[in-house]
Amino acid sequence: MQVDPVVYQLQRAVSQDPIAVKDAEGHLNNWKKEPGFFGKLYSIFLDKQNDMSLRWIAIIQLRNSIDIIWRKNTKMSLLPEERDFIRCNALLGSIKSENLLSIQNALVVSRIARLDYPTEWPSLFHDLLGKLQQSLGTGDYDVALRLLITLHHIIKAMAGNRLLRSRQIFYKLAPELLTILQPILHSSLSSWMMILESSKEIKDSTLLSYMQISRYTLKACRRLVVFGFQNPSESEFSERMLAFCAVHQRKLLSMLGTMLQSSRSPIVVGECLEMAFAHAFLFNKPFFDFSFYSPCLTKFPATIDYISLHYDFLGQISSHLSSYKEKFEESSKNFEKLVIMSLRVFILVIQEFCNTKSSHPETAQVLYNSFLVDNRINNLLDLLITKLLILKEEDFEEWTDSPQQWVLEQSTQDVEFNVRPCAEKLLKCFFDAYGDIIVSPFKDMIYSVFECPKTLTQAVQQDTLISSFGVGYTQLKSIFPFAKWLQEAAVPNMASINDIGISRVYRRRIAIFLSQWIEDSSSEQLLEVIYKLYCSFLNLTDPCNDAVVILTTIDAFKTVLDDWNFSENSFLSIKENLFVHVLSLFKAFESVDARTSILSLLGTLLARAGEHVAPMESTIASLLSQLWDGWKKEPLLRARVLAVMHQFVNAIKAKSFEFSTFLYTVIEYCVNPESPEHVIFEADAMELWSTFLMYIQKLPETFTLLIPHLLYHLSQATSTLPFVLMIVSSYQLLDNTVLMKDYSFTIFEKLNDLLDDVKNETLQALCKTVCLLIETTPMDMIYESLLNSSLLSRLLLSIATNDKHPQVLIEYLLVVSRISLREPELILKVCQTKNINIAMLIGNWILLNDHINHSKDRKLNTLALSSLLRTNHPDVLAVLDSIMNLWFSVLSEVEEDANGDATIYYKNDDYSAVGFYLDETSEEMTRRKQLLLKDPVHSVNSRSFFISVFMFCRDANGGMENFQNQYLSTVNPALLEQFQSML
């Protein structure tokens, strides 16, 4: 029997032969443009006689293409009969398929529904809900579950629509769906909760069916109440749903808490227990969604219920928090997530009433008071400090077994995945909202942190107390004697603690605490003590400094060094020891996160030390070279090394010339377009390259070898283009022949090609670079290149035809003005060669002067136009009247000194390199200042220049009489009279 070719290729696509798989994928991709192919795929999926793997690959192929093929007027659009076939059998595909296949079919149906409902598929929900109610009525829970999964994915897809018409359709649909789904949700929830409340050991498979049905119904309802109403805060459906979830959340959490408290084995195990936890998380999802998408918790009465039920839950399990991992070994992470979920509820409520107390003062006050009922806030504080913030046995196990991973988990700012950071966040919220109430209990605990811990238990308790004082810095700084504690407790205690375990706990907490209180440490004496402590914590030879202490210190010390209270003198006094300790850390840690942290601290040390890095330059450069060579398989670390190299060059400035060979090797690898990783490193390497050129006094020979790579990147209109232009400028300022002697034509052509690809600031940077090249290069070296390249003719043609926005033409005009000042004949020669109308060019040139914003650029433009008069070209002399008007405009606007300079001629970006900041102490700044002194705008006296041009034109035209007859007769007599007074 002949095998269908599509079936054959699908069978090959799921085979174990990689060659067959690749060949089959090629055939399947080619067939996607053939009419009827996707209809064939769906019929293969629907045929239950086919192998499951075959049906799986068929529906996956359809799912991956549905977004493209279902849109009309595309090359892969479906035939109308294919669309009808898929729509007619879509629900059948969910009903008759196994659960895994049904989910994939649901994804296909959801994407079709998003586009076709209600215009092309008006009966979708009528048919789906009818079959759903029928299956529930007959007790066919497997079919009901598959239909609910399909409905959930349809609602999820439609809820993500952002088009106004689609949103309005969804708003109209949501109440109708909720009316049908809410009874199903209530019935299924009640059924399985009654079974659980019976407290008998449960083995009934029906329980799982009820739980699965309620889970997907709850998912669908959640999307509907959150996204199905334009203003959820004003919807009765949303309010009722949140209240419904609160009631059932209380029941479920109470059951789970009772299981934890009970000495018996849990009555629910395996998949049913996982499903119970899933419901506990889902009941809270609408609460979190309302807070995130449409902040309105203050308007819902059920918010008070959520506070109450989660407070009761935490109170119920507080004494068993240390035993849940043994009790629910396989679901311990889920129990931890429940605790985090409860803490997050409190965090969101506090944040919302803080944000809405001005807009909704009454309801915000109700929420505020809810934490004061039954001494809740003090009980929660006690729970945080004695149960959740305290280090536990499993913490010390992970501290020993996986120190780097443990530090990463503890330092994370993501409160959704770790109990301790979440508890710290809640404590911070309590301090912010109830600071005046909770400060008082902390007064009684102040001197507890002065005591020296004698045992590990005492150290752990003190760790929690100090952590609390760190979190509440803003509210506690007025009552906590930080300086006294540091000098009379912290430093002496560390010296007197002999137990390594106690010392490690104490040092870790001190490192964190100092970074939290650094703002209160403005005195030189305190900062010196703090810096010395951090330096001692980074010493690998001290047995008390294990991986946890060192990694915690690295992150904390970076925060301290970044603070505005930084003391240079105190830092420099321990600088050498710091660098020695930090440089020795790279061999001690292997994880990417740890090495990244060390590199980050090294970069901060370099930035703070600056030129005081000496005499460590060679040692640091050698280490960076070793790291670069040793981490060839770690691109993320190499990228960080590049950033530190940049900070290193910034620190040692001109001395970086000594390491030019090493820097050349790194930069060449990173910017070479043939390098396999140049895309990853290109931007960082460009920044390093430009910074190095900024500080050196002369160009290293090796860096001339990078010019071909520079020219390649000059032709790429990517995000690195500003750096490329900056590097071109730096090369030119270092040696005005190294680029232009051999590459001037190529450079001008590449710059011309970029004109259409760049806009706004990048266009200004490009034109500024061209101006620099023209100013600094001998004209005989670039004359032919300017004449023959497309750049100058392109600029002149745009000005003559006025084909760009005036601000773009101004940038072009400034480039042309630089050329005209140096070689006016070249302008006319290009016009003649390229058939550009000179009269139109000069006319538009003069008109554009009104669009020039800065007086410096107006003077440059006028000097350039005046230079054109020296060509004695009739078309230029014909507009002498307009040019003389510009003369008097310049002369009346600014009062110049004898050299032609004036304060107003200086611009903010005169010393910037293509818009980038330039270090005032850099060699490039010196070079730019010297160039600026030679700029005609600052060195040519306008009055003298205009007079000399006038005299030249008079003499070139046979004296005053002939000049008068030919050209001056068209000039306004008042202008001539005014000019005569200048002579």
Swiss-Prot record:
InterPro entries: ARM-like, ARM-type_fold, Exportin-1/Importin-b-like, Importin-beta_N. It comes from Schizosaccharomyces pombe (strain 972 / ATCC 24843) (Fission yeast). Its main location: nucleus. Disulfide bonds: none annotated. GO terms for biological process: poly(A)+ mRNA export from nucleus; protein import into nucleus. The gene is kap113. It comes from the Eukaryota. One of its GO terms (molecular function) is nuclear import signal receptor activity. PROSITE patterns: IMPORTIN_B_NT. Functions as a component of the nuclear pore complex (NPC). NPC components, collectively referred to as nucleoporins (NUPs), can play the role of both NPC structural components and of docking or interaction partners for transiently associated nuclear transport factors. Active directional transport is assured by both, a Phe-Gly (FG) repeat affinity gradient for these transport factors across the NPC and a transport cofactor concentration gradient across the nuclear envelope. Involved in the export of mRNA from the nucleus to the cytoplasm. This is Importin beta-like protein kap113. The keyword Transport applies.
